[in-house]
From Swiss-Prot:
Function comment: Zeins are major seed storage proteins.
Protein name per its UniProtKB record: Protein FLOURY 2
Subcellular location: Endoplasmic reticulum membrane
Domain of life: Eukaryota
Claim: Transport is one of the keywords in the record: no
Organism, as annotated: Zea mays
Source taxonomy: Eukaryota, Viridiplantae, Streptophyta, Embryophyta, Tracheophyta
Signal sequence range: 1-21
Other information: The floury-2 (fl2) mutation is associated with the synthesis of a novel 24 kDa alpha-zein storage protein and an altered protein body morphology. The 24 kDa protein is expressed as a 22 kDa alpha-zein 16 with an uncleaved signal peptide, resulting in an enhanced Lys content of the grain and a soft texture of the endosperm.
Transmembrane annotation, as ranges: none
Length: 262
């Protein structure tokens, strides 16, 4: 009797265990590499280790942060290469004309090459051209400084003509150096022609040549103003070379004794 009761209890236990039991599917044992094919990425990351998730997140952030500067650098390098290519093409296009200019006029070629690198040329073209013209007259300036330092210093001072038109000013200064010598040579070689050139500029010389000569001697010699005899002597000395008869016969040129004067 007791054996039957134990057998019934065992059967009841088996029935209860059979109703509560469940079967584990084999797909749950699949590797994690197959999971992303059936689940979204976030769900697949959830099955991974937290350290692996943090590492993969750092890789994604670093790639996104470095991608934009690299693209900008690539664009800048492409733009620089494009500009360099255009400049090279333009240089090759103008190279024959520049070579011809260098052969024909080296000064103009060098001036054109230095024009862009000169701040004065970019700021004030007129001043730069004036400076270039002044450099052409540097030999004349050096000669003027050696012959007459006073005039050279005057040129360097604040002269309106020197600042406005340096070549014209230098030409006038050189003429002032040459004209006295030419005038002196003309007066020594041909006094009549020299006086004839001076006559139209003085009414006294036109009306009375003797008085004009006397006036010039009085202006040049203060002793003639104080002593009329000296003025007469100088007048005679001035008029003596213009006596045609005495010029033809030097024996008739009687010297004047100066003892009575002094």
């Amino acid at each position: 009797m007791a054996t039957k009761i134990l057998a019934l209890l065992a059967l009841l236990a088996l029935l209860v265990s059979a109703t509560n039991a469940f079967i584990i599917p084999q797909c749950s044992l699949a590797p994690s590499a197959i999971i992303p094919q059936f689940l979204p990425p976030v769900t697949s990351m959830g099955f991974e280790h937290p350290a692996v998730q943090a590492y993969r997140l750092q890789l994604v952030l670093a790639a996104s942060a470095l991608q934009q500067p690299i693209a900008q650098l690539q664009q800048q390098s492409l733009a620089h290469l494009t500009l360099q290519t255009i400049a090279t093409q333009q240089q090759q296009h103008f190279l024959p004309s520049l070579s011809h200019l260098a052969v024909v006029n080296p000064v103009a070629y060098l001036q054109q090459q230095l024009l862009a690198s000169n701040p004065l040329a970019l700021a004030n073209v007129a001043t730069y051209q004036q400076q270039q013209q002044l450099q052409q007259f540097m030999p004349a300036l050096s000669q003027l400084a050696m012959v007459n330092p006073a005039v050279y210093l005057q040129l360097l001072s604040s002269s309106p003509l020197a600042v406005g038109n340096a070549p014209t000013y230098l030409q006038q200064q050189l003429l002032q150096q040459i004209v006295p010598a030419l005038t002196h040579q003309l007066a020594m070689a041909n006094p009549a022609t020299y006086l004839q050139q001076l006559l139209p500029f003085n009414q006294l010389a036109v009306s009375n040549s003797a008085a004009y000569l006397q006036q010039r001697q009085q202006l040049l010699n203060p002793l003639a103003v104080a002593n009329p005899l000296v003025a007469t002597f100088l007048q005679q000395q001035q008029l003596l070379p213009y006596n045609q008869f005495s010029l033809m016969n030097p024996a008739l040129q009687q010297p004047i004794v100066g003892g009575a004067i002094f």
